[in-house]
């Protein structure tokens, strides 16, 4: 994920900073405790696509 993109992306709920977790391919909002998936290099910034941070990463984002 490009660092320029990370500089402008914010959490769609609280408008807070996001952290990119490369190993999980997720953008994490620590304030809302949500992880947004990155699919094929494209962040999916929908609340409905996010998983709670307390949910296991391997079962998240199943559609």
From Swiss-Prot:
Signal peptide: none annotated. Pfam families: Trm112p. GO terms for cellular component: cytosol. InterPro entries: Trm112-like (IPR005651). It comes from the Bacteria. PANTHER family: PROTEIN PREY, MITOCHONDRIAL, ZGC:162634. This is UPF0434 protein BAV2101. The lineage of its organism: Bacteria, Pseudomonadati, Pseudomonadota, Betaproteobacteria, Burkholderiales. Belongs to the UPF0434 family. It comes from Bordetella avium (strain 197N). Transmembrane segments: none annotated.
């Amino acid at each position: 994920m490009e660092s320029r993109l990370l500089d402008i992306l914010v959490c769609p709920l609280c408008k807070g900073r996001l952290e990119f977790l490369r190993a999980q391919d997720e953008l994490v909002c620590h304030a809302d405790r949500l992880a947004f998936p990155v699919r094929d290099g494209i962040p999916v910034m929908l609340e409905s696509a996010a998983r709670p941070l307390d949910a296991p990463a391997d079962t998240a984002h199943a559609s």
